[in-house]
Amino acid sequence: MFYELNIRAGYGKEESENMAEEAFEIYFKGRNTVTFYEGVIETFELLKNDYSLGVVTNGNADLKVIGIDNLFDYIFSAADLNAHKPDPVMFEAVIQKTGLEAKEICHIGDHPINDVKASLEFGMTPIWFNDEKVDFPLEGIQVNEFSDWHSLPDLIKKL
């Protein structure tokens, strides 16, 4: 897209290619510059001792570049699966790869529809990361929630 905009703006083919590559590098670097919530890394390290951990993401950040891929046994991205949450394809991939039943899986996420409702409808146990400490916006759904990453291991043990 950036390449085509440069061509339309009157830049030559080679210059447009170079500018598009440079723009993508800047975007990729920015997309993989992450500030973690307090306690999130320590919590994943602790959970990894007792559970198999995976990521189901619509995002395009590279966990290896970020430096946290070692915390997860499975990574399911929308780009790899050609689907986005709440599409059941995302959750079916988890079942297929892990060999677990849906009822054995806790899905932790911050989006009421894409994470909580979708995983619940698939038969998983959703846990809502409610960092803004607001009421759950969807009626008729009882959901386990947390706002402090340090509290997550105890919440999971209670389920």
Name each model feature, range by range.
Residues 1-24:
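A metal-dependent, Asp-based hydrolase signature
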Residues 5-9, 30, 78-79:
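Alpha-helix C-capping/helix-to-loop hinge sites
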Residues 14-17, 41, 45-46, 51-159:
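Asp-based, Mg2+/Mn2+-dependent phosphohydrolase catalytic module
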Residues 25-34:
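Surface-exposed cleft-lining segments at the edges of enzyme active sites
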Residues 37-38:
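Active-site core of PLP-dependent enzymes with the aminotransferase class I/II
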